[in-house]
A protein has these predicted regions:
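Membrane-interface micro-motifs in multi-pass membrane enzymes
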Residues: 69, 116-167, 194, 348-360, ...
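Signature aromatic-anchored transmembrane alpha helix within multi-pass, membrane-resident enzymes
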Residues: 10-19, 175-185, 228-237, 304, ...
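Luminal/periplasmic acceptor-recognition loop/helix of membrane-associated glycosyltransferases
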Residues: 441-531
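Membrane-proximal lumenal/periplasmic loop motifs of glycosylation machinery
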Residues: 30-38, 52-74, 81, 88
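Membrane-interface helix-loop-helix junctions at transmembrane boundaries of multi-pass membrane enzymes
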Residues: 172-177, 213-230, 294-334, 344-347
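Transmembrane-helix motifs of polytopic, lipid-linked glycan transferases
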Residues: 10, 17-22, 92-120, 161, ...
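Hydrophobic/aromatic-rich transmembrane helices and adjacent perimembrane loops
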Residues: 150-158, 199-200, 296-304, 325-373
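Short periplasmic/luminal acceptor-recognition loop of GT-C membrane glycosyltransferases, typified by
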Residues: 419-455
Length: 541
């Protein structure tokens, strides 16, 4: 009994911390429409079209971000058939994926970690090590894993599923055929979506399994792991090949194949080496050293997490923790694979290193497991909790501070539009937030000033701009129920209004003024929206 009470004391603070992070993520998901940026709204729109057309591949689209099979937008499509609200559906789907990640983390590492260690890792997994300045919209973690259109959540889930199976094979524990089939099917569907799983899971997993089998060919467990890794690689490759044969109905005027990762470009090896390394350091949090003194603690925390990840690997090797060290080696190899691909093959974005968000929670849990002595463990617990509290302040406080102001700002715009009978808005990439706050009562179609109209008076003044909307919304325009909205942001030279003012010719301005009449202007500290009415339905090239 005393031992159980002692164990509870060890992990109770982590339980409370995990619950705080969890409640915060859920609150953001269901109150975050005013943070919906272009990509988030695009994914919510994808879910809506999937539900309406009962297909993962909606027809006649201008541009959908990628194929979605088991990603959050695909899950949101199921919720849309119930709620008929794309933003609410995406909130439900993102929250479900968040909970599944936490549950899958627990299930995956339960065979090698005690409950206190698992809870310390779960606390970090819930967000304590995702360093950023906005829990709702940070593309360095929260938005792509947990909040509002969490696209990368599916990759992390499938990775955890495979690691859990690998650990059970290594520990000689039974693994059901249904679980194996689920993992292989998931690998196939992610292959259809993109090449990310091939890079972060399939290749490093196969290489480690192959090396371990070559070292000990007589071990049946190593042989099973190799067969599983090879099957995963094969299924993912089959998905990639299937991607090439699926007829794409999106009809994009801008991208012929939106499901592939961008190539590395034509820079030198040295340049690409620097860019790939910078992307990794950006994700880790060391990027904050370049900002003011307010952000220096977050940069220091990023350095500490980097040291923590390396220390955990050394300690596991020293303690001869076979499975713990193998999984950590896999995570490091996965990160190195992304880095190498960035140097040799693709153009790396920071979020491609998302395995970091698994490496640090796992490192935390393994350190907690292997530290000897109550004093060391107590100090480690306090340090981890303080780091989590500091990160919570940096991530949550900025959103909480401006929540009410932003909510009121966008509510006023939506009310004005509805009072004037507007059902469709055409605008640049900073305006979908307005449609998100309307709860699907107002439809958004993305447009941008047409540079070609500078010299061609017959060309339309606007062009579609990467929006996941059926192309009929650009053909069958109803001016009496439509408005053009252009944004002006002091932080963005490519905001629609600023681009119009600074980059287009006098003849274009004359045509624009003759076609559009400004009706309203809404201004906040971050952005100003100019609303125009028009009567000519042929405004789009």
């Amino acid at each position: 009994m005393q031992k159980d009470q002692l164990n509870r004391k060890k992990y109770l603070p982590f339980v409370i911390g995990t619950l705080i992070w969890g409640v915060t993520v859920l609150w953001i998901n269901f109150h975050g429409a005013q943070w919906f940026n272009f990509d988030m709204f695009a994914d919510a729109s994808v879910a809506k079209r999937m539900a309406e057309q009962h297909s993962f591949f909606p027809k006649d689209w201008v541009f959908g971000n990628q194929y979605y099979i088991i990603a959050t937008p695909a899950i949101a499509a199921l919720f849309y058939s119930i709620f008929h609200n794309s933003v609410l559906s995406m909130s439900c789907a993102s929250s479900l994926m968040f909970l599944l990640i936490l549950l899958c983390f627990w299930w995956s590492f339960r065979p090698i970690l005690s409950k206190p260690a698992l809870w310390s890792g779960l606390f970090c997994m819930a967000g304590a090590t995702i360093l950023g300045d906005s829990i709702s919209s940070s593309t360095y973690g929260f938005q792509i894993l947990y909040t509002m259109a969490s696209y990368y959540a599916c990759y992390l889930l499938v990775l955890l599923l495979h690691l859990g199976i690998w650990i059970r094979m290594g520990k000689r524990l039974p693994v059901s055929r249904g679980l194996l089939l689920l993992a292989l099917t998931a690998s196939f569907t992610l292959g259809i979506q993109s090449q990310r799983e091939m890079l972060t899971l399939c290749i490093p997993f196969f290489l480690i399994a192959l090396l371990l089998w070559m070292r000990n060919k007589s071990d049946s467990g190593e042989k099973k792991t190799l067969v599983f890794a090879l099957s995963t690689l094969g299924m993912n490759l089959a998905g990639l090949l299937c991607n090439g044969y699926i007829r794409q109905h999106q009809g994009s005027r801008y991208l012929s194949n939106v499901s592939s990762i961008e190539d590395a470009g034509h820079g030198s090896i040295g340049t690409r080496f620097f860019e790939s390394a910078k992307a990794f350091l950006d994700l880790v949090g060391i990027r904050y050293f370049q900002y003011g003194w307010k952000w220096k603690p977050l940069a220091l925390l990023g350095m500490l997490l980097l040291i923590l990840g390396l220390t955990a690997l050394v300690l596991c090797l020293k303690k001869k923790d076979r499975m713990g060290s193998r999984v950590l080696l896999f995570c490091w190899l996965s990160l190195f694979g992304v880095f190498a691909a960035g140097v040799l093959v693709i153009q790396v974005r920071a979020i491609y290193y998302f395995v970091w968000y698994l490496l640090i929670p796992l490192s935390t849990a393994l350190l907690f497991e292997h530290l000897s002595g109550n004093k060391k463990k107590s100090f480690f617990c306090v340090a981890v909790l303080l780091c989590g509290a500091m990160n919570y302040f940096y991530n949550v406080y900025p959103d909480a501070a401006k929540y009410q102001t932003q909510k009121q700002f966008y509510s006023e715009i939506v009310s004005w539009l509805e009072e004037n009978g507007i059902r469709t808005i055409y605008g640049d990439y900073q305006t979908p937030t307005i449609a998100a706050c309307s709860g699907d009562r107002i439809e958004f179609c993305s447009v941008f000033p047409n540079m070609a109209a500078n010299s061609d008076e017959q060309s339309g003044l606007l062009v579609p701009y990467g929006s996941p909307v059926a192309t009929e919304r650009y053909r069958d325009i109803e001016p009496e129920q439509s408005a053009l909205i252009l944004s002006d942001s002091p932080y963005d030279e490519m905001s629609g209004y600023r681009y119009l003012e600074n980059h287009l010719s006098e003849p274009y301005h004359s045509r624009f003024d003759a076609c559009f009449s400004q009706q309203a202007c809404f201004e906040s500290a971050q952005v100003t929206y100019y609303i125009y009415f028009f009567s000519d339905p042929d405004i789009i090239a």
